[in-house]
Amino acid sequence: GADYIPEDCIYSKITPERIYELLDTAVACHFNCIRIWGGGYYPADVFYDYCDEHGLIVWQDFMYACNVYELTEKLRESIIEETKDNAGRLRHHASLGLWCGNNEMESAWDHWGGFNDHSDTLKQDYLTMFEKLIPEALKSEDDVTFYWPSSPSSGGNFKDPDSDDAVSYTHLT
């Protein structure tokens, strides 16, 4: 499989034909999974319809990536609304194989630095967002599809080399 990242930064240039061409290539390469990268956007329904029809499993990230967020009340409400809206829209697709909370945010704690001033508060905010808010909101719309908090993730147990799905830099220190 591979990550799907936006094929154009101008959304109006993305047509069903471009989506079909890209996914036809994935099928021709014998991919069986496409991961919707959390630094992009949620694709149009034609993307998921194609995956349903052609046997591609979708790993669906929520659109949180490569950052650390302070959990304000407004963000809390937005997270719940975004989760419910997208789960409600996508849950019926046979291709939907996995929900993932974010891209590389958990690993940011150990490898990117710069969080020392507020690290305890921000770490708790992270855990609240991806170990509590999203899974709870998701259950109300899709209680069947598996949820994983981050890619990579150790389930909130930062720095545990025996409990995460690793990327190359997670075990270098």
Tell what function each PLM region has:
Residues 1-67, 76-98:
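Active-site-adjacent substrate/metal-binding segments within catalytic domains
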Residues 12, 109, 157:
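Short acidic, gly/pro-rich beta-turn/loop elements at beta-sheet edges
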Residues 40-42, 64-66, 103-107, 154-155:
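Solvent-exposed loop/turn segments at secondary-structure junctions
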Residues 45-47, 69-71, 157-159:
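Short Asp/Glu-rich motifs
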Residues 72, 76-85, 89-153:
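Active-site neighborhood of glycoside hydrolase catalytic domains
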Residues 163:
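Active-site loops of AMP-binding adenylate-forming
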Residues 170-173:
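Conserved small/polar residues in nucleotide/adenosyl-binding loops
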